[in-house]
């Protein structure tokens, strides 16, 4: 088990549908740490859901809010943070994540993303007739950024959230 001194912040990055929120909750529970989801914090602070923020402020307005939330949360101690899929597009966010905790990239396939997100109406970037093409374009843009910022990479395709959380804990303990 990780000691209190070893309980640095754990930041989860990766595409939508990779399991960041679900795995993050398992990690936080098992490590007795506090869990945050940056999208949920944005919704709490604005009093509106992410789709509304996108509709009213556009992606740019959303990203400004996201930068503020990530700046605030990464200054906490002993937390698990599930970031939004596009958070790594901001160089500021990448710098803060790298400097203030251990970054784990949760990797998944486009097929798994489609399966996990197809009924989710809370994903503004997928409200399109061509979600596969959107996910492929996002992967081409963002995957190199996830790799750049991450200390560890874990594939989430065919494993339960609990198994992935245990893998991450084992990796951190070996550190």
From Swiss-Prot:
The keyword Transferase applies. One of its GO terms (cellular component) is cytosol. Keywords: Amino-acid biosynthesis, Aromatic amino acid biosynthesis, ATP-binding, Cytoplasm, Kinase, Magnesium, Metal-binding, Nucleotide-binding, Transferase. Binds 1 Mg(2+) ion per subunit. It is found in: Cytoplasm. SUPFAM superfamilies: P-loop containing nucleoside triphosphate hydrolases. Gene3D superfamilies: P-loop containing nucleotide triphosphate hydrolases. Its EC number is 2.7.1.71. It is an enzyme of class 2 (transferase). Coiled coil: none annotated. The keyword Cytoplasm applies. It catalyses: shikimate + ATP = 3-phosphoshikimate + ADP + H(+). GO terms for molecular function: ATP binding; magnesium ion binding; shikimate kinase activity. It comes from the Bacteria. Mg(2+) binds at residue 21. ATP binds at residues 17-22, 123, 159. CDD domains: SK. One of its GO terms (biological process) is amino acid biosynthetic process. Belongs to the shikimate kinase family. Monomer. This is Shikimate kinase. It comes from Photobacterium profundum (strain SS9). The lineage of its organism: Bacteria, Pseudomonadati, Pseudomonadota, Gammaproteobacteria, Vibrionales. The gene is aroK.
């Amino acid at each position: 088990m990780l000691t209190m001194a070893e309980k640095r912040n754990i930041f989860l990055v990766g595409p939508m549908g990779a399991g960041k929120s679900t795995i993050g909750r398992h990690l936080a529970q098992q490590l007795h740490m506090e869990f945050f989801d940056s999208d949920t914090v944005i919704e709490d602070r604005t009093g509106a859901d992410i789709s509304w923020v996108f509709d009213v402020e556009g992606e740019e307005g959303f990203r400004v809010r996201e930068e503020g939330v990530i700046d605030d949360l990464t200054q906490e101690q002993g937390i698990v943070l599930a970031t939004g899929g596009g958070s790594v597009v901001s160089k500021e966010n990448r710098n803060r994540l790298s400097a203030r905790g251990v970054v784990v990239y949760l990797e998944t396939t486009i097929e798994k993303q489609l399966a996990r997100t197809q009924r989710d109406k809370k994903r503004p970037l997928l409200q399109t007739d061509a979600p596969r093409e959107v996910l492929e374009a996002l992967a081409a843009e963002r995957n190199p950024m996830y790799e750049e910022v991450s200390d560890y990479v874990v594939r989430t395709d065919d494993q339960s959230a609990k198994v992935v959380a245990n893998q991450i804990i084992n990796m951190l303990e070996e550190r």
